[in-house]
Amino acid sequence: MGLLGYFRSDIPKKSSAKLAKDRLQIIVAHEHSNAVCPAYLPEMQNEIIEVIRKFMKISNDDVKCEFSDNAEDDMSVLEVNITLPKNR
């Protein structure tokens, strides 16, 4: 084996385009997972509360909103829990 044999590898190397694509996908997935909640979420929550208030009396404390983002399934979930009054 010559001197250049030490620098060569039997493992096929990825092309620079493939390597760049893989790195970009990792960065995009990381940025997507760091997104806590969309900017429109507070406004949406207020509008949901206003629609429900047309039909029954509730306070802001009766509404719990939770936003979760699952990067694996490429799905976002907005869960809204409303404690309804006993006398509807």
UniProtKB/Swiss-Prot annotation:
Keywords: Cell cycle, Cell division. InterPro entries: MinE (IPR005527), MinE_sf (IPR036707). It comes from the Bacteria. GO terms for biological process: cell division; regulation of division septum assembly. The keyword Kinase does not apply. It holds the Pfam family MinE. Signal peptide: none annotated. The keyword Cell cycle applies. SUPFAM superfamilies: Cell division protein MinE topological specificity domain. Belongs to the MinE family. Prevents the cell division inhibition by proteins MinC and MinD at internal division sites while permitting inhibition at polar sites. This ensures cell division at the proper site by restricting the formation of a division septum at the midpoint of the long axis of the cell. This is Cell division topological specificity factor. It comes from Psychromonas ingrahamii (strain DSM 17664 / CCUG 51855 / 37).
